[in-house]
């Protein structure tokens, strides 16, 4: 059984026991997170497709960690003009583990 959820402006295919990093959600480590924006649920040949969301479906997850991704370097340069600009960015994330999918 798997589901497609939407969180943080992105879509993820999840199933029980899966660990994934999503955009930061302000919750405590070890607490339960309920995601109710479920776009699709599939159980074998039985597929429930939402328009846009599957009504009554939800995904439960446990928060494992709050952290920051590796630094992404942004570098701009104009050739022959001695213009160079460097910037870095680290995005916050929440690591979760899927504990249950309910329809």
Curated annotation (Swiss-Prot):
Gene for this chain: rplU
Lineage: superkingdom: Bacteria
InterPro entries in the record: bL21-like, bL21-like_sf, Ribosomal_bL21, Ribosomal_bL21_CS
Stated family: Belongs to the bacterial ribosomal protein bL21 family.
Name of this chain's protein: Large ribosomal subunit protein bL21
Keyword annotations from UniProtKB, A to Z: Ribonucleoprotein, Ribosomal protein, RNA-binding, rRNA-binding
Pfam families to which the protein is assigned, alphabetical: Ribosomal_L21p
Organism annotation: Nitrosospira multiformis (strain ATCC 25196 / NCIMB 11849 / C 71)
Cysteine disulfide links: none
GO biological process: translation
Quaternary structure (record): Part of the 50S ribosomal subunit. Contacts protein L20.
Entry GO MF terms: rRNA binding; structural constituent of ribosome
Keyword Cytoplasm applies: no
Purpose: This protein binds to 23S rRNA in the presence of protein L20.
GO cellular component: cytoplasm; ribonucleoprotein complex; ribosome
């Amino acid at each position: 059984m798997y589901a497609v959820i939407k969180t943080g402006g992105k879509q993820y295919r999840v199933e029980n026991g899966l660990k994934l990093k999503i955009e930061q959600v302000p919750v405590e480590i070890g607490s339960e997170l309920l995601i109710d924006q479920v776009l699709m649920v599939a159980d074998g040949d039985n597929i429930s497709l939402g328009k846009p969301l599957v009504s009554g479906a939800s995904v439960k997850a446990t928060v494992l960690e709050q952290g920051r991704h590796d630094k992404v370097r942004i570098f701009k340069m104009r050739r022959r003009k001695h213009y160079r600009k460097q910037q870095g960015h680290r995005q916050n994330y929440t690591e979760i583990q899927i504990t249950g999918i309910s329809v």
